[in-house]
Amino acid sequence: MQDKLNQIKELALVEIKEAKDSTTIDTIRVKYLGKKGELTTILRGMGSLSKEERPIVGKLANEVREVLEAELEAVTKAVKEAEKQEKLKNEVIDISMPGKKQTIGKKHPLEQTLDEMKKIFVSMGFAIEDGPEVEKDYYNFEALNIPKNHPARSEQDTFYINDNVVLRTQTSPVQARVMEKQQPPIKMISPGKVFRSDAVDATHSPIFYQMEGLVIDKDITFADLKGTLELFAKKMFGDKVKTKFRPHHFPFTEPSAEMDATCFVCNGKGCKVCKGEGWIEILGCGMVHPQVLRNCGIDPEVYSGFAFGFGVDRMVMLKYGIDDIRLLYESDMRFLNQF
């Protein structure tokens, strides 16, 4: 048994010294020291030895194990260092090769346009207000002069969570909340996400962005509304832009209008963006309805005001000539990298 142990030791040491890579070393380790290795097999068979032989063989076997483990560790370190140096040698950097372009983050075109619009209105003295996206029915409808059974309450247009709670269909509820808690003068915008129960297509999305504005004070007239929005249009689209107002109907304003601007693609000459008309619809607006003021605790005999609202997605599409709203929400970097 002792001769066999010495023989295993000599053979193993020879194999270890000849090992040139980590795989060979692992194979040798398993061959001699593994669960079914040659040295392990001898240790398991010591029960058949006499009492006199058992301690002698056991001591020798442990000495052989210690020698092999020490040698394996030393050779493993040397081999791994050699492999590392070989890898570094083969991975020489060619400094003449062009570098890899770093991916640089940028703002989404929606965010860019929102920031630009907010900057313009803040420069005109407007404050930015925010409110909940999950809104009470009262603030989304009744406070804004949209009573029960009004067509705008149709389940086809609105996401109802329950009878009294909806996903806001506009950012106008923010205006109602501000009027309730703050006495005039009020000058604010309320940008944010809104929700409509619309089927997804090139021009409709169930989630989109709006920015609405409100001014309340004494002696506010339609001329103030017109001047404010014309100034915004010039700052947003350039000094040469022209605007016009068309009569319209909104339940929360009276009188109401829609504002058009000369097409900034063709400068009013007519193109596919403006459908040959030379004008593009930009926003809805009007003088705040007296009932809305009363609902929010403001005396319409003392105060008046105007309100307006933009579809931010529409502004982005018009500004950049985008013909499908879905492109704004698909996170396609080939598209987004153009902005």
From Swiss-Prot:
One of its GO terms (biological process) is phenylalanyl-tRNA aminoacylation. It is found in: Cytoplasm. Mg(2+) binds at residue 254. Keywords: Aminoacyl-tRNA synthetase, ATP-binding, Cytoplasm, Ligase, Magnesium, Metal-binding, Nucleotide-binding, Protein biosynthesis. Its cofactor is Mg(2+). Binds 2 magnesium ions per tetramer. Signal peptide: none annotated. It catalyses: tRNA(Phe) + L-phenylalanine + ATP = L-phenylalanyl-tRNA(Phe) + AMP + diphosphate + H(+). Pfam families: Phe_tRNA-synt_N, tRNA-synt_2d. GO terms for cellular component: cytoplasm. One of its GO terms (molecular function) is catalytic activity, acting on a protein. Belongs to the class-II aminoacyl-tRNA synthetase family. Phe-tRNA synthetase alpha subunit type 1 subfamily. Tetramer of two alpha and two beta subunits. This is Phenylalanine--tRNA ligase alpha subunit. It comes from Clostridium perfringens (strain ATCC 13124 / DSM 756 / JCM 1290 / NCIMB 6125 / NCTC 8237 / Type A).
